[in-house]
């Protein structure tokens, strides 16, 4: 008998081998119809997979995240099937699942047009309605290579030829189309009902710029129509909020080809930057951090000791001077260890918290650069905590509380926490990792937060806590990290004198809350659609006169606001007041003050809040009180 244990703990027994589909049928017709795949002892398999031993089994439907991934993977193959039907000369390459969708790369003699995409999507719908069965076949490698070569599919043949000869090859067949894939796939094309092709872009074969340029068709696929509609609406909102457009329209920053991946900050954009930096500086000082500054360029020997030269060199900008090799720092940690090492440290000095708004540079591929979100030159709110093993929990707890408080001040109330655990390849003993992982768990538990654990996702030198913030349109952004480093202090010779006068290695906690300033400012701009709260807005107030006779009064109001620390300016142009109001409203200024003769004579201002909200006429002192409250409350 074969015993199948289901997710609810119940068991079903079968006299002999049984497929996932047959198990689903034994539970109920509805489940059998909904089944997309199975999960056998944690591994995803097709519904046709035959079970010949005792296992734990979950039936995967479109209600499961794994089920949606199977739908997307299968839709990528449906896309390739449709392309081959319409354009037989096109050659197929690869088609993986990505976040919210999939893509497939093709080699074809001409670029695909928007009209082609519409025709391909229509053909995909036709193939879905045919509800053709999707079957898995096992081939040996050489026969599979010969098959694809005979079909003129040189790219697919090349992929298969790179697989070890003794490894079985899985091919999936639907109708006239056959493709290489590890699977699993939906049982038939009729399961694929909700999809949309999004765009076409260029992509190099195997990601190598020296290879041929292919065409990558992107698509999205979902279990339900309403899920896809919500996603497409979110994309429309994201397009409106694109920080690159806002940067231009609000005159905050620009990028140009002469400095790829590096930002030219304009006065208003730099004002926002300074508001964020000064806020973070105040929070770090209050939390017991000492701010430091380390060199931008350091000798190769230091990067060799830290391991960056061996493991990270291709992402570093390097240079030579007087026959010595140097690198522009891609991160701040080795420099902070040098400060720790400068002088003899005692256990009484710990924990030592060193913070730096450190400018770093990483040689990211030009094709990966994206506005402020992916750059080559960036500044981090970086800090490193040197502490004893006994202090890990308290320091991690304090950091977690600080991070949540900062996110709350910036308006991010929904924060997800993930704990990345030991990878297969790692430094340090299991005992040390047990202690490190449990220390981070204890800290998170002490803070009362829920977290998701990601086995195998930690760095080789230690486990990591990640902080993911959700923005106004539901997108998740990973910003903060807390990483426990068991390796760098040893590589760079960091030590302190313990209470018993022995020499010990400190534990090193790498931590950041915002991450890259550039990226965080991009997230902020998109979250608020450019309408930054008053405490962050580059211009908090614009004072406008109706006629020349109020110009002096308007200027006096501005000077009064400036002296009280607010960011204000006067618009004294000889233009209609409606024109001025409209122009500054488009610049998303939090408050517009209008002054005429009545306001001047009474020492008052007519106040309009952003969004064309008329707050009426009030004394200047009352407006100042309101604005100060906004700034204090981070409104």
Swiss-Prot record:
Belongs to the class-II aminoacyl-tRNA synthetase family. Zn(2+) binds at residues 333, 384, 510. Residues 1-61 form the TGS domain. One of its GO terms (molecular function) is tRNA binding. Its EC number is 6.1.1.3. CDD domains: TGS_ThrRS, ThrRS_anticodon, ThrRS_core. Gene3D superfamilies: 3.10.20.30, 3.30.54.20, Anticodon-binding domain, Bira Bifunctional Protein, Domain 2, Threonyl-trna Synthetase, Chain A, domain 2. The gene is thrS. Binds 1 zinc ion per subunit. Catalyzes the attachment of threonine to tRNA(Thr) in a two-step reaction: L-threonine is first activated by ATP to form Thr-AMP and then transferred to the acceptor end of tRNA(Thr). Also edits incorrectly charged L-seryl-tRNA(Thr). Keywords: Aminoacyl-tRNA synthetase, ATP-binding, Cytoplasm, Ligase, Metal-binding, Nucleotide-binding, Protein biosynthesis, RNA-binding, tRNA-binding, Zinc. One of its GO terms (biological process) is threonyl-tRNA aminoacylation. Its cofactor is Zn(2+). Pfam families: HGTP_anticodon (PF03129), TGS (PF02824), tRNA-synt_2b (PF00587), tRNA_SAD (PF07973). It is found in: Cytoplasm. Homodimer. GO terms for cellular component: cytosol. It catalyses: tRNA(Thr) + L-threonine + ATP = L-threonyl-tRNA(Thr) + AMP + diphosphate + H(+). It comes from the Bacteria. Residues 242-533 are annotated as: Catalytic. It comes from Cupriavidus pinatubonensis (strain JMP 134 / LMG 1197) (Cupriavidus necator (strain JMP 134)). This is Threonine--tRNA ligase. InterPro entries: aa-tRNA-synt_IIb, aa-tRNA-synth_II, aa-tRNA-synth_II/BPL/LPL, Anticodon-bd, Anticodon-bd_dom_sf, Beta-grasp_dom_sf, TGS, TGS-like.
């Amino acid at each position: 008998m074969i015993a199948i244990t289901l997710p609810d703990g119940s068991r079903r027994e079968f006299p002999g081998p049984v497929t996932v589909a047959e198990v689903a049928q034994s539970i109920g017709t509805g489940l059998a119809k909904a089944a997309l795949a199975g999960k056998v002892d944690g591994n995803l398999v097709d519904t046709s997979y035959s079970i010949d031993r005792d296992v734990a089994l979950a039936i995967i439907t479109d209600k499961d995240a794994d089920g949606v991934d199977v739908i997307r993977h299968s839709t990528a193959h449906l896309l390739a099937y449709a392309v081959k039907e319409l354009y037989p000369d096109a050659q197929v390459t690869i088609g993986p699942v990505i976040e919210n969708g999939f893509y497939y790369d093709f080699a074809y003699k001409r670029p695909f047009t928007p009209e082609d995409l519409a025709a391909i999507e229509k053909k995909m719908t036709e193939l879905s309605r045919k509800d053709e069965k999707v079957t898995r076949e096992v081939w040996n490698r050489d026969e599979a290579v010969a098959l694809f070569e005979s079909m003129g599919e040189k790219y697919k043949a090349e992929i298969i030829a790179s697989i070890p000869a003794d490894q079985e090859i899985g091919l999936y067949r639907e109708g006239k189309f056959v493709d290489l894939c590890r699977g699993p796939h939906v049982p038939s094309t009729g399961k694929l009902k909700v999809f949309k092709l999004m765009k076409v872009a260029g992509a190099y074969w195997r990601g190598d710029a020296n290879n041929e340029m292919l065409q990558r068709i992107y698509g999205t696929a979902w279990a339900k129509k309403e899920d896809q509609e919500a996603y497409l609406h979110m994309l429309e909102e994201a397009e409106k909020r694109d920080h690159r457009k806002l940067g231009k329209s609000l005159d905050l920053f620009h990028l140009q080809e002469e400095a790829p991946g590096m930002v030219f900050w304009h006065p208003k954009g730099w004002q926002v930057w300074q508001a964020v930096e000064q806020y973070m500086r105040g929070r770090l000082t209050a939390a017991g951090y000492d701010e430091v500054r380390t060199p931008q360029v350091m000798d190769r020997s230091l990067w060799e000791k830290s391991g960056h030269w061996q493991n990270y060199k291709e992402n570093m900008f390097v240079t030579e001077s007087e026959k010595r090799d140097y690198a522009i720092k891609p991160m701040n940690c080795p420099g902070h260890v040098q400060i720790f090492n400068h002088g003899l440290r005692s256990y009484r000095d710990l924990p030592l918290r060193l913070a730096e708004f450190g400018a770093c540079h990483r040689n990211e591929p030009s094709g990966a650069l994206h506005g402020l979100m992916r750059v080559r030159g960036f500044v981090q709110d970086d800090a490193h905590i040197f502490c004893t093993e006994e202090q890990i929990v308290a320091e991690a707890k304090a950091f977690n509380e600080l991070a949540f408080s900062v996110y709350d001040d910036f308006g991010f109330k929904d924060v997800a926490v993930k704990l990345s655990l030991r990878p297969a390849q790692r430094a340090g003993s299991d005992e040390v990792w047990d202690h490190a992982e449990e220390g981070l768990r204890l800290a998170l538990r002490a803070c009362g937060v829920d977290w998701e654990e990601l086995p195998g996702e930690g760095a080789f030198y230690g486990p990591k806590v990640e902080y993911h913030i959700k923005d106004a349109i539901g997108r998740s952004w990973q910003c903060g990290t807390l990483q426990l480093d068991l390796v760098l202090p040893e590589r760079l010779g960091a030590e302190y004198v313990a209470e018993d006068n022995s020499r010990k290695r400190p534990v090193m906690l790498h931590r950041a809350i915002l991450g890259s300033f550039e990226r965080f400012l991009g997230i902020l701009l998109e979250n608020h659609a450019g309408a930054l709260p008053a405490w962050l807005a580059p211009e908090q107030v614009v004072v406008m006169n109706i006629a020349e006779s109020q110009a002096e009064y308007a200027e006096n109001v501005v000077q009064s606001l400036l002296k009280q620390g607010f960011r204000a300016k006067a618009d004294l142009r000889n233009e209609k007041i409606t024109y001025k109001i409209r122009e500054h409203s488009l610049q998303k200024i939090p408050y517009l003050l209008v002054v005429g003769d009545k306001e001047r004579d009474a020492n008052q201002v007519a106040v309009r809040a952003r969004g064309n909200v008329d707050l009426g006429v009030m004394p200047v002192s009352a407006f100042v009180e309101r604005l100060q409250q906004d700034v204090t409350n981070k409104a």
